[in-house]
């Protein structure tokens, strides 16, 4: 059905106790140059991944609402991905399936919506302005369209600063999962003014 402007999916409120599960510690130590060959190689290794999936904890905190959910993210091809949000009880709150030119979202009532812009759809239906188009790169440890960023001492992203559509996002990476090759982000925090988005990845499967 067409995407309405007024409908909001009501996710369960965020319990105060879960905030620590998504805490982010800024990496210490000197950073590396974005022009380094090691950083270029790391980016290329990540971009060469054809398929990947991760699951973990999601928190959104603002003056208007606090939301906690479990998430599952699966990329099956270029611009083909699936995002699933479940509440702490394990029930599905929303499922989003995207492919070039078409995005479908099913809410917690089983209602189906279609659009050509996943980021706009998520924002209208949940009230959370998640920068999904950029997050698809950031969650992999890639800067996307951002040109203002810093690396850690292992030639991986540690911070991103990015402005678009009136939003000024700062992304801080708290660590990487070195059990995968290439190493993938283990947790991250996005902030824009009074809004915070926290992601903690439990594990990665990459191909």
From Swiss-Prot:
Residues linked to a lipid group, N-palmitoyl cysteine type: 22
Compartments, record wording: Cell outer membrane
GO cellular component, one term: cell outer membrane
Membrane topology label: Lipid-anchor
Lipid moiety-binding residues (S-diacylglycerol cysteine): 22
PROSITE patterns (alphabetical): PROKAR_LIPOPROTEIN (PS51257)
Primary residence: membrane
One GO BP annotation of this record: lipoprotein localization to outer membrane
Signal peptide feature range: 1-21
Disulfide bond positions: none
Keyword list, A-Z: Cell outer membrane, Chaperone, Lipoprotein, Membrane, Palmitate, Protein transport, Signal, Transport
Transmembrane segments annotated in the record for this chain: none
Family: Belongs to the LolB family.
Protein function: Plays a critical role in the incorporation of lipoproteins in the outer membrane after they are released by the LolA protein.
Subunit structure: Monomer.
Protein name: Outer-membrane lipoprotein LolB
Native species: Escherichia coli O7:K1 (strain IAI39 / ExPEC)
Gene (name only): lolB
């Amino acid at each position: 059905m067409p995407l309405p402007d007024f409908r909001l999916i009501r996710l369960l409120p965020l319990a105060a106790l879960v905030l620590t599960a998504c805490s982010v510690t800024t990496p210490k130590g000197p950073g590396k140059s974005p022009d380094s060959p090691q950083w270029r190689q790391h980016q290329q290794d990540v971009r060469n991944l054809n398929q990947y999936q991760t699951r973990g904890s999601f928190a959104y905190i603002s003056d208007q609402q606090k939301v906690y959910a479990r998430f599952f993210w699966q990329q099956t091809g270029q611009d083909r991905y699936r995002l699933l949000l479940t509440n702490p009880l394990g029930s599905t709150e929303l499922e989003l399936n995207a492919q070039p030119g078409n995005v479908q979202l099913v809410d917690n009532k089983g209602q189906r919506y279609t659009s050509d812009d996943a980021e706009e759809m998520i924002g209208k239906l949940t009230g959370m302005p998640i920068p999904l188009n950029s997050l698809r790169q950031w969650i992999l440890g890639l800067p996307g369209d951002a040109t203002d960023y810093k690396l850690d001492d292992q030639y991986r992203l540690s911070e991103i600063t990015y402005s678009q559509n009136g939003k000024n996002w700062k992304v801080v990476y708290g660590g990487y999962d070195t059990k995968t090759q290439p190493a993938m982000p283990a947790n991250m925090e996005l902030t824009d003014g009074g809004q915070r988005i926290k992601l903690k990845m439990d594990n990665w499967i990459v191909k």
